[in-house]
């Protein structure tokens, strides 16, 4: 028995998406967002699906691909301060179950939004642009890459 030895991760960002119940909470939050948008009376169903998709993808982009460092003061802050949350996740390993889940969820939401908007051209373009903006940074080829120097520091 190790008395007085901490058993937590050095950087909690690396394992947060592997926590128990986090995927279910993620799905419930997206469902709640959709229900809140459906409760607004002057939004049509296609607009609600497009808004759900765009808000989800915008939030995912901000929290996973623009915010850098850790929200905690950790011993590895020197290394993690230049990495986004996506780059820190699962210690930088590609194709883990958490990364697959976070890559598939925008695609499923995109397919649902496309179906319920009946592939209307305007909604389709907005949903496709939103999907590409959140899916491209997740590719392994973009790990650590800062396009046009955006978010370099």
From Swiss-Prot:
TM regions (residue ranges): 22-42, 43-63, 106-126
UniProt membrane topology term: Multi-pass membrane protein
Highest taxon listed in the record's lineage: Eukaryota
Cellular compartment(s): Endoplasmic reticulum membrane
GO cellular component, one term: serine palmitoyltransferase complex
Keyword Cell cycle: no
Keywords: Endoplasmic reticulum, Membrane, Transmembrane, Transmembrane helix
GO terms classed as biological process: ceramide metabolic process; intracellular sphingolipid homeostasis; negative regulation of ceramide biosynthetic process; sphingolipid biosynthetic process
Tissue/organ expression: Widely expressed. Expressed in adult and fetal heart, brain, lung, liver, skeletal muscle and kidney. Expressed in adult pancreas and placenta and in fetal spleen abd thymus.
Pfam families the UniProt entry points to: ORMDL
Residue intervals annotated with topology Cytoplasmic: 1-21, 64-105
Extracellular side: 127-153
Subunit structure: Ceramide-sensitive subunit of the serine palmitoyltransferase (SPT) complex, which is also composed of SPTLC1, SPTLC2/3 and SPTSSA/B.
PANTHER family linked: ORMDL PROTEINS
Domain notes: Ceramides bind to ORMDL3 N-terminus and stabilize it in a conformation that physically restricts the accessibility of the substrates to their binding sites in the serine palmitoyltransferase (SPT) complex, hence inhibiting SPT catalytic activity. In the absence of ceramides, the N-terminus is flexible and permits substrate binding, thus liberating SPT from inhibition.
Family label: Belongs to the ORM family.
Purpose: Plays an essential role in the homeostatic regulation of sphingolipid de novo biosynthesis by modulating the activity of the serine palmitoyltransferase (SPT) in response to ceramide levels. When complexed to SPT, the binding of ceramides to its N-terminus stabilizes a conformation that block SPT substrate entry, hence preventing SPT catalytic activity. Through this mechanism, maintains ceramide levels at sufficient concentrations for the production of complex sphingolipids, but which prevents the accumulation of ceramides to levels that trigger apoptosis.
Protein name per its UniProtKB record: ORM1-like protein 2
Organism annotation: Homo sapiens
Phylogenetic lineage: Eukaryota, Metazoa, Chordata, Craniata, Vertebrata
């Amino acid at each position: 028995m190790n008395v007085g030895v901490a058993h937590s991760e050095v950087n909690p960002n690396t394992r947060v998406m592997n926590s128990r119940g986090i995927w279910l909470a993620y799905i419930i939050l997206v469902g709640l967002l959709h229900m809140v948008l459906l409760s607004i009376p002057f939004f049509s169903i296609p607009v609600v699906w497009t808004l759900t998709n765009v808000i989800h993808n915008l939030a995912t982009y901000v929290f996973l691909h623009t915010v850098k460092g850790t929200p905690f003061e950790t011993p590895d802050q020197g290394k993690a301060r230049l990495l986004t949350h996506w780059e820190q996740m699962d210690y930088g390993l590609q194709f883990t179950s958490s990364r697959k889940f976070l890559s598939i969820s925008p695609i499923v939401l995109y397919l649902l939004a496309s179906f319920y908007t009946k592939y209307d051209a305007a909604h389709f373009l907005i949903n496709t642009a939103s999907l590409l903006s959140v899916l491209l940074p997740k590719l392994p080829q973009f790990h650590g890459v800062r396009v046009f120097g955006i978010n370099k520091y």
